[in-house]
UniProtKB/Swiss-Prot annotation:
Membership in a protein family: Belongs to the troponin T family.
Lineage of the species this protein comes from: Eukaryota, Metazoa, Chordata, Craniata, Vertebrata
Signal sequence range: none
Residues where N-acetylserine is found: 2
GO cellular component, one term: troponin complex
Protein task: Troponin T is the tropomyosin-binding subunit of troponin, the thin filament regulatory complex which confers calcium-sensitivity to striated muscle actomyosin ATPase activity.
Keyword terms, alphabetized: Acetylation, Muscle protein, Phosphoprotein
GO molecular function: tropomyosin binding; troponin C binding; troponin I binding
Segments of skewed composition (Acidic residues): 1-25
Region (Disordered) residue spans: 1-58, 97-178
BP GO terms, sorted: regulation of muscle contraction; sarcomere organization; skeletal muscle contraction
InterPro entries with a match to the protein in the record: TNNT (IPR027707), Troponin (IPR001978), Troponin_sf (IPR038077)
Protein name per its UniProtKB record: Troponin T, fast skeletal muscle isoforms
Stretches with biased composition (Basic and acidic residues): 46-58, 97-139, 167-178
Amino acid sequence: MSDTEEVEHGEEEYEEEEEVQEEEVHEPAPPPEEKPRIKLTAPKIPEGEKVDFDDIQKKRQNKDLIELQALIDSHFEARRKEEEELVALKERIEKRRAERAEQQRIRAEKEKERQARLAEEKARREEEDAKRKAEDDLKKKKALSSMGASYSSYLAKADQKRGKKQTARETKKKVLAERRKPLNIDHLNEDKLRDKAKELWDWLYQLQTEKYDFTEQIKRKKYEILTLRCRLQELSKFSKKAGAKGKVGGRWK
């Protein structure tokens, strides 16, 4: 306890005792016995230790200023850490974005290489198929050219029929092109468009069915032609052998 507080406390005790004494004086009571009374005096402050209230106030102000400065420093330190964390977060986001862009670029390059490789393989297969087909056609032509004159005439007739079929096919395409009408559907409502779509679907289904039937017929015809060619080859060989056996010494046996 400071000296000032001791002085104040002593004064308060002294005043309380005086009030008690005054109350006792006013109350009617029998004359008390005389006792020696103790005289209370306020404690004296030493001359060398005077209390400076201005100094105490300054110390309190300095303490408040120090606490306020500590709060300000703490606030700015927290703000600085938040800004550093925000900058680090932005850097991580930019880094992740750059990594994602690099991954997409690498993926696009790989996809481009894959597409180029597929296109190259497709072109190579088509070239091999075309070469194989050309070789097969050449072999067929050589095999057919080695046949007899009768078979050559048969081929000529077959080519003539094929030419007629091709001419008929071209004529058919021309007729179909002339018969084909433009599809005017701008003025149709939803129900009519649905009916028109169903009609076109049925027509396409019918065409596919006819195409399948014609394809099967062509396959059967090709098989029959191939069978006839094999029979002609066998007959030509048999006729050559029979002619060699029947003629002896320049005259028939």
